[in-house]
């Protein structure tokens, strides 16, 4: 499911985004942040992180460097190790 969302975002970046003026106030951009979240997190956590990020990206925000929080990597619950 995560891979499907990533492909949809990449399609948006290739087809729709070039038609719009640059608007993201953050580094990395909201689409790059969302792709990273879906690569490194579970589906529901990635949705939550991405939605919160997009809500913060508005004209009232100054914007700044905003990477994924450090403790967002998927964890294998049976062994406690990080998985990719």
Swiss-Prot record:
The keyword Transcription is annotated on this UniProt entry: no
InterPro entries named in the record: Membr_insert_effic_factor_YidD (IPR002696)
Mode of membrane association: Peripheral membrane protein
UniProt keyword list: Cell inner membrane, Cell membrane, Membrane
UniProt-annotated stretches for the region Disordered: 61-84
Amino acid composition bias (Polar residues), ranges on this chain: 72-84
One Pfam family this sequence matches: YidD
Subcellular location: Cell inner membrane
Record's GO cellular component terms: plasma membrane
Secretion signal, residue range per the UniProt entry: none
Family: Belongs to the UPF0161 family.
NCBIfam families: membrane protein insertion efficiency factor YidD
Record's function text: Could be involved in insertion of integral membrane proteins into the membrane.
Protein name stated in the entry: Putative membrane protein insertion efficiency factor
Species the sequence originates in: Leptospira borgpetersenii serovar Hardjo-bovis (strain JB197)
